[in-house]
């Protein structure tokens, strides 16, 4: 096996562990207690307008996707963990919001270059193992002149 293959195998194993960890707890309950006010802050900060095509990366259960959809944006929510997306679908359905929910890896987003006016992540993408690869993907899928917005914490807190 080559070093590249070992790295890919290690990455796949790490992402599988991440997916399992996020799926085992009650992330949705924690998120609705800890970060509910941050979604509207991110939506306002990125200047999301009606009709904007928005990608929420590492969307979880939709803490930023839902306020973006309420603002009239066409939202795609992507996350590594399907169980979290299921919670988001339920929240969106209860409000009559249309959001496209897709399982996806922040380091290899399944979207064409320049597909989105706004790409954002609310306390999500920071958990991806390879930050540079994730940042490169955010830039790639955001149209030239588009906006990227993140809310994350730093190692210092």
Locate predicted features.
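Conserved alpha-helix/loop element of class I SAM-dependent methyltransferases that forms part
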Residues: 32-52
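Class I SAM-dependent methyltransferase SAM/SAH-binding core
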Residues: 53-108, 133
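A short glycine-rich, Lys/Arg-flanked "PGG" loop and its adjoining helix->strand segment in the class I
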Residues: 132-147
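N-terminal, positively charged/glycine-rich alpha-helical extensions of SAM-dependent methyltransferases
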Residues: 1-23
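Class I SAM-dependent methyltransferase Rossmann-like catalytic core
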Residues: 25-30
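A short SAM/SAH-binding and catalytic strip from SAM-dependent methyltransferases
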Residues: 117-131, 154
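Conserved class I S-adenosyl-L-methionine
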Residues: 147-157
